[in-house]
């Protein structure tokens, strides 16, 4: 009753939901039988068979993109984005609505060059794809610093993230809109 009254739903997120596709499908099917809206959030770094299996039973896929440039992606995430982009390209051919989520991280992916590369990539991948629902830009925060400190560990991103500056989220948003790409800049923070 709560979900019908609130208009809410359930989002499966991570870790990485695509690492447990059979369980995720069962949960999603049960929720949908109850009339509850479902979404999955994924980084897309999973076998296509898992992405396809889970995505086809969800009402919405929230797909994380961090960087367009593969070399930078490997540097900052430890993995190539080739699989992620191939999965996204295939996902956009399914009938499931897809929203791209981009954490805007100062000094990592908010330069004019990287913003333009990301938006060009998105334009090319999503052209003519009716499943594409737009972009959610998520400003980065450093809340994790405190958690690492409590554990007596160094925060791995402390040497990477540009300190003392706001991200260029508003610039990213304006460039996306100028290119005709539906985008929002979240007031919620990620990190």
Locate predicted features:
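A C-terminal junction/extension of Radical SAM enzymes
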Residues: 165-191
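A broadly tuned preference for mixed-charge, low-complexity surface segments
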Residues: 66, 94-98, 114, 154-162, ...
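A structural motif corresponding to the C-terminal lobe/cap of the Radical SAM core domain
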Residues: 120-123, 133, 148-175
């Amino acid at each position: 009753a709560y979900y019908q009254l609130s208009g809410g739903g359930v989002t499966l997120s991570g870790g990485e939901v695509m690492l447990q596709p059979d369980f995720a499908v069962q949960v999603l099917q049960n929720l949908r039988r109850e009339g509850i809206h479902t979404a999955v959030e994924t980084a897309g770094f999973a076998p296509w068979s898992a992405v396809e299996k889970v995505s086809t039973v969800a009402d919405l896929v929230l797909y994380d993109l961090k960087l367009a440039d593969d070399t930078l992606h490997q540097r900052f995430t430890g993995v190539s984005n080739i699989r992620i982009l191939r999965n996204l390209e295939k996902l956009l051919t399914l009938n499931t609505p897809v929203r791209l989520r981009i954490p805007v991280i100062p000094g990592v992916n908010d330069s004019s060059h990287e913003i333009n590369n990301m938006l060009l990539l998105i334009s090319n991948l999503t052209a003519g794809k009716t499943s594409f629902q737009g972009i959610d830009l998520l400003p980065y925060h450093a809340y994790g610093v405190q958690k690492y400190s409590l554990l007596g560990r160094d925060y791995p991103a402390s040497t990477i993230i540009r300190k003392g500056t706001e991200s260029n989220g508003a610039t990213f948003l304006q460039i996306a809109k100028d290119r005709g790409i539906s985008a929002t800049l979240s007031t919620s923070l990620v990190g």
